[in-house]
Every structure is written in C-alpha cells, then in structure tokens.
Amino acid sequence: MKPLVIGETYRTQGRTIGEGDVSLFAGLVGDFTPIHVDETFAATSPHGTRIAHGPLSMSMAIGMATLTGLFGARVIGLVNINWDFGGVVKLGDTIRAEVTVEALRPSSKPGRAVATYGLRVFNQTGAEIQAGRMVVVVRAD
C-alpha cells in the first residue's frame, strides 16, 4: 500500500447514475419516496424529474474513491461520517469525487492509525453537489 500523505488528493473516474442504480438502492434500503421512484410525481417537484437518493450518490462517491486504491486493505473500520447534500443528482447525471487526506494520527492501539478524509462530489458540469468528511481507523503504514 502506498503511504498516506496529508494533503494528497485523489480524483476518481466518473460514474453515471441510472435507473437501475436508483431502483436497486430503493429496494435495498426500503426507501420508495416518490421523488426517487415515481416520475409522474417527480415531474411536479421543483426538480422536474426524479432524483437519486442522497445516500446513494454518497455511497457511490465513497465506492469510486475505493477504486483509487486509497482505502482497500488498509481500512479497519469507519469511525464517523459527516456529509452535506448541497445539490441533487438526477438520473443520467455523471458524478466524480475528489478525496483528500486531511489528517493522520496514531491510534491508541498498536499498528493502527486514525485518518480523516475530505470528500467532494461533482456533477458532469463541475458543480460541487456534495461534500463530507470520513474518519477511518486504518492500518498504520
């Protein structure tokens, strides 16, 4: 594993959110809120169409960050997550993320450290739509 470097930023590839993603997520978590699954209802909303669940796009951003090799085998467990949903993700939108190593400190347990990651999520126009922080227990490098 490449050592974590405070201030280093990783950029993910993009991923387009589709019908299957929203349907599967709704079924998995049991959230069938009309704004996500009912186009007729959603057409009358301020968004004019259905939007993806906020936690779906957050989870996809974290998953895309995992594909950079930043997390993987080094992760022991999630301590905390704090997330802001500043914009919506419509079906057909493509999101990407940037992840920055913000802090790294030793854990009280040998061989472990506590890493803080800042994440920013952007849509296909480059607008920031979500941002958050994750605190994760990791294997010490």
Regions found by a protein language model. Give the residues of each.
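Catalytic strand-loop segment that frames the active site of acyl-thioester-processing enzymes
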Residues: M1-A52, V138-A140
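HotDog/MaoC-like acyl-thioester-processing domains
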Residues: M1-I6, F85-D141
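Aromatic-residue detector
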Residues: K2-L4, I17-V22, I51, M60, ...
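A generic structural signal for short beta-strands and their flanking turns/coil linkers
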Residues: I6-E8, Q13, D21, D31, ...
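Short, surface-exposed, polar/charged, turn-prone segments marking secondary-structure boundaries
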Residues: D31-F32, D38-A43, G63-M64, V79, ...
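Hydrophobic beta-strand-centered segment that forms part of the acyl-chain substrate-binding groove
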Residues: A43-A52, L56-E102
